[in-house]
Every structure is written in C-alpha cells, then in structure tokens.
Swiss-Prot record:
Keyword Thylakoid among UniProt keywords: yes
Organism name: Phaeodactylum tricornutum (strain CCAP 1055/1)
PANTHER family the record matches: ATP SYNTHASE (PTHR15184), ATP SYNTHASE SUBUNIT BETA, MITOCHONDRIAL (PTHR15184:SF71)
Protein name: ATP synthase subunit beta, chloroplastic
GO cellular component: chloroplast thylakoid membrane; mitochondrion; proton-transporting ATP synthase complex
Source organism phylogeny: Eukaryota, Sar, Stramenopiles, Ochrophyta, Bacillariophyta
EC number per UniProt: 7.1.2.2
Record membrane topology: Peripheral membrane protein
Amino-acid positions noted as binding ATP in the UniProt annotation, renumbered to this chain: G156, G157, A158, G159, V160, G161, K162, T163
Function: Produces ATP from ADP in the presence of a proton gradient across the membrane. The catalytic sites are hosted primarily by the beta subunits.
Domain of life of the source: Eukaryota
One MF term in the entry's GO annotations: ATP hydrolysis activity
Length: 475
C-alpha cells in the first residue's frame, strides 16, 4: 500500500451542521482549511475549519447535511481551502458550493481550480477613475447609472421583473462588452433557480449544444442546503468571477440572489460556533464577513466585476442590521415598482426611487446630468398632480400643468423598452440603446419637439427615431 502523508483526525462531536474534529499533536489544520469525511456508504462530506479550540481540536462547518455522520469517523485534512473549477469550462453549467456540477450534464473538464478564500486586490491594482458601465437599458443608464466595478442593490417584490432584468443584463454585457456573467443563487427557492435555468436556455443565454458559447456560469446553494453551503456559495461564485476578470481580463457581471441569505446563513452558524450574538441576534462578525465578500468585488487595471445584488429587506425594515450593512457597500440602487409593472411598463424600474452615486457632474456629462434631473422633476410634478386629476379631472389643471402631464406620460412610456430575452412575450425585437441616443431622445421629449406625437408611440420602443416611426404607423 502506498504510504500517504495525509493529515488525518476523527470526529468527536456533532451539533447540527457544526462538528468538532480531533487531530494528532502538532497537526492542526489552519482556519478555512477543507476537511473531507467519507461515510460508510462512500459518500463524501466537505467541512470547513472555523475555529481552533485547543486540545488539538478544530470546530468546522459542514457544506452538506450531517445526516448519517457519527463520532469516530475519519476526517482527512485536504491541506487547502475549498477549491473550485474556474474558467471557460464553467460556462453554461450549474455548480454547488464545492464546485461539483449539479445539472446532470456530465462531468466538467477543467484545467484550473482556485481557493474560495482569497485576498481583495491590493490598492495598487485598483482602477481609481470612476467610469459608467453602459447597460443599454434606458432607464438605468439615464437615471441610476451603474459604476464599472461597482455594486448595485436590486430591490423588488415577487413578480415585478427581477429575473427578466437580470437575464437582459447578462445578454447585454455579452453582446456589448464581450463579457461574461456569474450567477450566485444564495439561499433562494430551488424552483426559482430551476426556472431561471430553463428561461436562460430558452433565451439563448445558455447554449446547450455548445456550453463554451454560453454567457453565464451558475452557482447554487439554495434554501434547502445547510447553512455552511449558503454561507460560502457567494464566495464560490465570486472566485469564478475573479478568474474571468484577472486571467481572461474581461468585464464580468456577478449576480447575487440574495445577499441577505448570506448574512442569514452566517447568523445560523454563529451561535453554534459559540459566538455571543449581537444586535437582533445577528453574528458579531457581520460587518467583517460582509466586507470580506464585498471588497473582492471591484475594478482592477485588468478588468472589472460589477455586482448586482438582490436585497431582501426583512419586514421592510431598512434599519435591520443585515440590509443596513449591505447599503454601506452599494454604489447604486435599482428599485422595481409594482405600480409600473401593473401599468405594463417594463422594465418596471422606479425612476424616482432608484439612485446612483455616479449621477454627478464630473463623472457624467453636464447634458446627461441636466436631462436626468429634468426627467425626475417632470415625473415628480406628475406624481403630485395625480391626486388633483383623480378628484377634479385633467381639464381643471392649468395649461402649463397639462403640458407637464402630457410630457411626463410620454417620458414614462419612453422609459419602457423591449428586451432581447423577452421577445417571446412582447413580440417586439429587443433593443440596446446607447447612452447618447437615450439622452437625445429624452431631451427632445422634454423640449416639446414631440408634443404632437401620441403617447402610445413612445411605449416599448428603443431610441427616439423608432418612436417617431411608430407614430407614423399609428396615424
């Protein structure tokens, strides 16, 4: 038998997803090491070291269910943190937290792996000049532009179009920036993960015939997984994204759905690890854990990772420590509105609630800034007049206010746009609208150059030329 120098220990205690493992004197694995445990039925469980307890024991968190584990089972120190496959072979596939494919499409032939725990880029590697990341979506680029290498919070309830917006962004970054996307499903519903996968195949974001031509890699750790998996799956997705940025020198979109579940999983494990809970029962290390994840998402001189994170707000309380800690890291927010979705205005991005730190003179052009402010002003005035219209009717408004309402309704409709991934639903071909065309279009509407066009001409079109052409067909 070949002699191996693997460091072995045995399980001494199991408390739910947390277990203690004893090693021989002087052979303690460092924190974040991966340890493999093989059960009687030959199934493997990977656990990650969280604490060194003294007496040659470590406390670890399991990435799989601990059902069937018993004390005395052998544990093998793998000598490294959890390593996951990276690079082009990951495209079009679904992985779990430890980098195993879970889509029943056969094994993944990969050349490289990377550890999920890595340092954030050094200051000298960072791209310091803020630049806008053009998405081709009018409402986003004009009113709440994304920062290249920034972090965006995506807020919205069920059924207002989060998934379709995410898929359109994946599609547009591939076409316009030659970039790829990584989707991290953190602690959300398995059904939603499956629906997203099926929709991506339908819309061509995932190419089943040739996975290498797909535009996205998927990493899932859903609600039914133990907290260890949900706590680490975000890091697995981030590691795959970092490879595309640092080695392939691409612009990468990283989606995390949902960032709150990352915090929630950490709080589930925290008490079992014997840590004193802090405010509202969250882990005392909440800000540190969030910072370790978020600081790795950034622009370097090689490429960028722009992250879009769905944010669940527990009980709609924005002061809850979990969302409050997340907000500190965000550069922009995209808020989806049920009211707009009910009107059929898609994408249902709320133009008054969505914000961005990029919308300031010096980063965007003066023309862009002035147009965006003018659009918001017009929509805000329309919002204020709606009560009067509802009670007295539009005829009771002054001439000036009636003109404002007419333009605001055109602006509202012009903020809608046909998506490439929604062609099946809308029957209209998708449109990518450049920032230049977007600004030009809204300027023309606000300056009154198109007051004689019917408002229906502005609904679900790309640039302003299409609206003018559509008006001709409506005559």
């Amino acid at each position: 038998m070949v002699k191996t120098n693997l460091n072995k220990g045995y399980v001494t205690q199991i408390i739910g997803p947390v277990l203690d493992i004893k090693f021989s004197e002087g052979n303690l694995p460092p924190i974040y090491s991966a340890i493999k445990i093989i059960l009687d039925d030959n199934t493997e469980t990977i656990v990650e070291v969280q604490q060194l307890l003294g007496d040659n024991k470590v406390r670890a968190v399991s990435m799989r269910s601990t059902d069937g584990l018993k004390r005395g089972v052998e544990a093998i120190d793998l000598g490294t943190p959890i390593n996951v496959p990276v690079g082009t072979p990951t495209l079009g596939r679904i992985f779990n937290v430890i980098g195993e494919p879970v889509d029943e499409q056969g094994e993944v032939k990969y050349d490289e792996t990377l550890p999920i725990h890595r340092d954030a880029p050094a200051f000298t590697e960072l791209e310091t000049k803020p630049s806008i990341f053009e998405t081709g979506i009018k409402v986003v680029d004009l009113l709440a532009p994304y920062r290249r290498g920034g972090k965006i919070g995506l807020f919205g309830g069920a059924g207002v179009g989060k998934t379709v917006l995410i898929m359109e962004l994946i599609n547009n970054i591939a076409k316009a920036h030659g970039g790829v996307s990584v989707f991290g499903g953190v602690g959300e519903r398995t059904r939603e993960g499956n629906d997203l996968y099926e929709e991506m195949k339908e819309s061509g974001v995932i190419n089943e015939k040739n996975f290498a031509e797909s535009k996205v890699a998927l990493v899932y750790g859903q609600m039914n997984e133990p907290p260890g998996a949900r706590m680490r799956v975000g890091l697995t997705a981030l590691t795959m994204a970092e490879y595309f940025r640092d080695v392939n020198k691409q612009d990468v979109l990283l989606f995390i759905d949902n960032i709150f579940r990352f915090t929630q999983a950490g709080s589930e494990v925290s008490a079992l690890l014997g840590r004193m809970p802090s405010a509202v029962g969250y882990q005392p290390t909440l800000a540190t854990e969030m910072g370790a994840l978020q600081e790795r998402i950034t622009s370097t001189t090689q490429g960028s990772i722009t992250s879009i994170q769905a944010v669940y707000v527990p009980a709609d309380d924005l002061t809850d420590p979990a969302p409050a800690t997340t907000f500190a890291h965000l550069d922009a927010t995209t808020v989806l509105s049920r009211g707009l979705a009910a009107k059929g205005i898609y994408p249902a991005v709320d133009p008054l609630d969505s914000t961005s730190t990029m919308l300031q003179v010096g980063i965007v052009t003066e023309e862009h800034y002035a147009t965006a402010e003018n659009v918001k002003e017009t929509l805000q005035r329309y919002k204020e007049l709606q009560d009067i219209i509802a009670i007295l009717g539009i005829d009771e408004l002054s001439e000036e206010d009636r003109l404002t309402v007419a333009r605001a309704r055109k602006v509202e409709r012009f903020l809608s746009q046909p998506f490439f991934v929604a062609e099946i639903f809308t029957g209209s071909p998708g449109e990518y609208v450049s920032l230049e065309d977007t600004i030009k279009g809204f300027l023309m509407v606000l300056n009154g150059e198109l007051d004689d066009l019917p408002e229906q001409a502005f609904y679900l079109v790309g640039n302003i030329d299409q609206a003018i052409a559509k008006a001709e067909t409506l005559k």
